[in-house]
Amino acid sequence: MEKLTILLLVAAVLMSTQAQNQEQRQQAKINFLSKRKPSAERWRRDCTSWFGRCTVNSECCSNSCDQTYCELYAFPSFGA
């Protein structure tokens, strides 16, 4: 009878430890995924959208600034 009691206690401790580890892994996964941003969201926030104020090309999402506003598209220049 004592062996059965000890065996049940050991099993209960192992199950408790396993459940706790599972909860920690799930929480770590939730934390990791909540910190990530979709690339589209990151892209929108890191640059100025079309017709926003700018001074250099790198400020615009289109990478095209006419020294005042962001252009919709970086038009190729045809040598004049």
Curated annotation (Swiss-Prot):
Q: What is this protein called?
A: Gamma-conotoxin PnVIIA
Point out residues bearing the modification 4-hydroxyproline.
P76
Q: What is known of its domains?
A: The presence of a 'disulfide through disulfide knot' structurally defines this protein as a knottin.
**Which molecular function term from Gene Ontology is one that the record holds?**
toxin activity
Concerning InterPro entries, the annotation shows: Conotoxin
Does the keyword Disulfide bond belong to this entry? yes
Give expression by tissue.
Expressed by the venom duct.
Q: Where found?
A: Secreted
Signal peptide bounds: 1-19
- Tell me the domain of life: Eukaryota
The protein's predominant localisation is secreted
Provide the residue ranges of the propeptide in this protein.
Answer: 20-43, 78-80
